[in-house]
């Protein structure tokens, strides 16, 4: 849904007649994909076969959620994901959108007028989620590690029982869409 990569991989696999190869559309990005890959590796180490791993990843991918606060919509506009009108209005009003990516769909959750307040709201939203305790929470950032460190501190303060909170810098492709000063959280719901 987010990109055509999974569809392209499936077409290629069908063309060459792959056997025991499963193409999975993760319906997520960045650290959300990291959660899936690490889980697949864990399942393999437990002795699961490719079919069992595929079935479990298909099940768990629907429970992955990604929350993020963006400093600007400029980069989403440049990448064709947001209209020029929306990007311009957000810039003029100094709106910092708080979004959720879940099941391949992007949803606007809130609008903040301050990037630090928007990022702090991510931890507050996470506090209201039913987290799967068997998975870590990943804090992602595009360019400003201090914002990620602040968010990590907020999560640890609000959710002291979270099994693991780790910081991850987003890659160049995601970074080119979300811009600088963006920060987010990837997690698995119950």
Regions found by a protein language model. Give the residues of each.
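Mixed-charge interfacial surface used for oligomerization/domain docking
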Residues: 2-22, 28-190
């Amino acid at each position: 849904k987010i990109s055509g990569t999974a569809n392209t991989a499936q077409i290629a696999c069908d063309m060459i007649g792959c056997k025991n190869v499963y193409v999975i559309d993760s319906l997520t990005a960045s650290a959300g994909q990291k959660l899936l890959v690490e889980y697949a590796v864990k399942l393999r180490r437990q002795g699961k076969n490719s079919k069992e791993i595929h079935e479990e990843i298909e099940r768990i991918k629907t429970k992955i959620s990604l929350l993020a606060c963006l400093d600007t919509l400029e980069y989403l506009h440049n990448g064709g994901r947001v209209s020029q009108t929306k990007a311009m209005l957000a810039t003029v009003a100094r709106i910092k959108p708080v979004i959720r990516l879940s099941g391949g769909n992007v949803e606007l959750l809130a609008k903040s007028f301050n990037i630090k307040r928007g990022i702090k709201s991510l931890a507050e939203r996470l506090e209201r989620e039913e987290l799967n305790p068997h998975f870590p929470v990943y804090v992602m950032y595009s360019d400003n590690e201090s914002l990620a460190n602040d968010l990590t501190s907020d999560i640890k303060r609000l959710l002291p029982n979270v099994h693991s909170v780790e910081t991850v810098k987003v890659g160049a492709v995601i970074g080119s869409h979300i811009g600088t000063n963006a920060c987010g959280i990837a997690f698995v719901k119950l």
